[in-house]
Amino acid sequence: MFQFLFFDLDDTLLDFHRAEAIAVSKAFRDMGVTPTPERIRQYSAVNKRHWQMLEQGLLTREQVLVQRFACLFQELDIPADPVACQAAYEEYLCVGHYFIEGAEALLAALAPKYRLYLASNGTARVQESRLKSAGIGPYFEQVFISQNLGANKPSPAFFQRCFARIPDFDPKKALMIGDSLTSDIRGANGAGIAACWFLSLIHISEPTRLAL
C-alpha cells in the first residue's frame, strides 16, 4: 500500500499552459511585442525544447531562462531584450495560478490518509509563490524544487535527495504522480519507485512517445 505520494506541480495540479500564455502575453507587451496566438505557441514550443535540454543535462537552469527568449526573438527577428523579458515574465508567472480541474479536491481528500510531497523542476521563487497564491502548500509535508536541491528530474540525484529528507521513507511505498513521461515517469522508474502518469486534456493533442 502506498504511503508517500509525490506530486509534480505544472500541468498536474496547476494549469501551467494557461499561466504561461497569460504571463508571456503581458511580458511581450512590456517589451513592445504584440502577443499574437502564433507567437505564444512559438514561445511555448521553444520553452519546452529548452526545458527538455535541461532534463538531458545540456543546459543549466540559468541558461534556459534567458536563452529561450533569446532564441525566440532571433526566430521572430525581433530586437527585444531577452533578459528584461525573462524578468517581466517571471514576475507575472509568480502571481498566476489556475487549477487543473479536480486537483484541489484531490489533495484535500488524500492529505488525511497519505504523506504528500511536491516534486517540481520549476524555479524556486516562482513555484513557491504560486503554491502560496493557490493555497495548497499546507497539503504537503515537504516541497522539493530542483533549484533548491541542486538536481533536476529525471536524474536519480533529484529523487535520492528528496528521499533522504523524509523520515522513515520506504521506496516500496512511494508513488510519483506527474504529467511528464521524460521527467516524472522516467525519473521515478530510475529512482526505484512506482509512477502514475497523469494524462490531461492539455496533452491529448500532442504526439505521445513513451520515454521509458
Model-predicted segments: where are they?
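Short acidic capping loops at alpha-helix termini that bridge into adjacent secondary structure
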Residues: 81, 138-142, 170-174
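Single conserved hydrophobic/aromatic residue that forms the stacking wall/gate
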Residues: 202-212
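Conserved Lys-Pro-Asp/Glu-containing loop-to-beta segment of HAD-superfamily phosphomonoesterases
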Residues: 152-185
